[in-house]
């Protein structure tokens, strides 16, 4: 069975497929480094996958894959948010520059 997820937005579509992630200790899940450095303990951290006779159980594999899939999706969405924020800042900066140019062209450079 292949574990997958799909992200759909008005301008983009992206499929995610779980790879052979070997841990339940996700990169983007759990408390932030700031919270941990402040002395908090991650009591909700999932246990590592259990094994029977040296082989990881089916549910353990599923949990590992879900953690990896969640990391992949979180990283992708974080990049999308950063790009949107950058675009918004660029647009605001362009509007400010255009307004300054129009003010100067209209002879408004003596105003203050």
Swiss-Prot record:
Name the source's superkingdom: Eukaryota
Q: In its keyword annotation, does this UniProt entry include Chloroplast? A: no
List this protein's GO terms for biological process: cell wall mannoprotein biosynthetic process; positive regulation of transcription by RNA polymerase II; telomere maintenance via recombination; tRNA processing
- The answer to keyword Translocase applying to this record is no
State its location(s): Nucleus; Chromosome, Telomere
* Keywords (A to Z) from UniProt: Activator, Chromosome, Nucleus, Telomere, Transcription, Transcription regulation, tRNA processing
Q: Which GO terms describe its molecular function?
A: chromatin DNA binding
Report which residue ranges the record marks as coiled coil.
none
| One cellular component term from this protein's GO annotations in UniProt | chromatin
Major location (coarse)? nucleus
Q: Which Pfam families match?
A: Gon7
- Relate the assembly described in the record: Component of the EKC/KEOPS complex composed of at least BUD32, CGI121, GON7, KAE1 and PCC1; the whole complex dimerizes.
Family assignment? Answer: Belongs to the GON7 family.
Q: Give the function comment from the record.
A: Component of the EKC/KEOPS complex that is required for the formation of a threonylcarbamoyl group on adenosine at position 37 (t(6)A37) in tRNAs that read codons beginning with adenine. The complex is probably involved in the transfer of the threonylcarbamoyl moiety of threonylcarbamoyl-AMP (TC-AMP) to the N6 group of A37. GON7 likely plays a supporting role to the catalytic subunit KAE1 in the complex. The EKC/KEOPS complex also promotes both telomere uncapping and telomere elongation. The complex is required for efficient recruitment of transcriptional coactivators.
Q: Protein name, please?
A: EKC/KEOPS complex subunit GON7
What is the species of this protein? Candida glabrata (strain ATCC 2001 / BCRC 20586 / JCM 3761 / NBRC 0622 / NRRL Y-65 / CBS 138) (Yeast)
């Amino acid at each position: 069975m292949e574990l997958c997820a799909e992200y759909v937005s008005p301008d983009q579509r992206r499929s995610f497929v779980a790879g052979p992630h070997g841990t339940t200790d996700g990169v983007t899940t759990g408390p932030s480094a700031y919270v941990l450095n402040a002395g908090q303990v991650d009591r909700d951290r999932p246990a590592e996958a259990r094994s029977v006779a040296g082989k990881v159980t089916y549910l353990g594999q599923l949990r590992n894959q879900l953690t990896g899939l969640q990391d992949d999706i979180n990283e992708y969405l974080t990049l999308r948010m950063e790009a949107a924020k950058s675009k918004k800042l660029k647009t605001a900066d362009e509007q400010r520059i255009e307004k300054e140019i129009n003010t100067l062209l209209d002879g408004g450079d003596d105003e203050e």
